[in-house]
């Protein structure tokens, strides 16, 4: 798999994306794309569509190429967790423990925290003002309520790639 940053055309097919909706707008982030040379590329952009206003997806550049990352939204902001990332063109894929935030109103990105463990396949949710990161590759669940804490390790349902942690 090539893991470089790649300019992808609009309306291309990609897999292993993460998606979330915020205020009638759909965001599809990262993923894998197979280019004309049959190389697999980790995508460094996000597609956005306001279902009431837009007739076509618009493209927003992400600070790093990501795949298998978790995503959630709260108060109109998008939060990203873990996954595999590429920061330099043709660099290696690396497990990621970064929690980053995107503000759609200002088009600004922020790094806000780091989980305890680097996670290659993750899910993210926020419940009662607490972030939970589910590691699908190693079965860990971490939570953030002021500091990161490991809440479960080797949880079988997570390791089995379940959509539900229990």
UniProtKB/Swiss-Prot annotation:
Alphabetical UniProt keywords: Kelch repeat, Repeat
Residue windows of the Kelch repeats: 25-76, 77-129
InterPro entries the record matches: Kelch-typ_b-propeller (IPR015915)
Family membership: Belongs to the poxviruses Kelch family.
Name of the featured protein: Kelch repeat protein B10
Protein species of origin: Vaccinia virus (strain Copenhagen)
């Amino acid at each position: 798999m090539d893991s470089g940053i790649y300019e992808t055309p609009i309306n291309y097919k990609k897999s292993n994306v993460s998606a979330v909706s915020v205020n009638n707008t759909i965001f599809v982030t990262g993923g894998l794309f197979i280019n004309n040379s049959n190389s697999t590329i980790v995508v460094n952009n996000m597609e956005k569509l306001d279902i009431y206003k837009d007739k076509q997806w618009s493209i927003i550049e992400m600070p790093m190429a990501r795949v298998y990352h978790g995503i959630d939204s709260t108060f109109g902001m998008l939060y990203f967790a873990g996954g595999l990332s590429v920061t330099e063109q043709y660099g290696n894929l690396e497990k990621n423990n970064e929690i980053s935030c995107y503000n759609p109103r200002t088009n600004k990105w922020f790094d806000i925290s780091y989980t305890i463990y680097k996670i290659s396949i993750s899910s993210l949710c926020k419940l009662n003002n607490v972030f939970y990161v589910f590691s699908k590759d190693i079965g860990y669940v971490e939570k953030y309520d002021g500091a990161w804490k490991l809440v479960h390790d080797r949880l079988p349902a997570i390791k089995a790639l379940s959509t539900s942690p229990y």
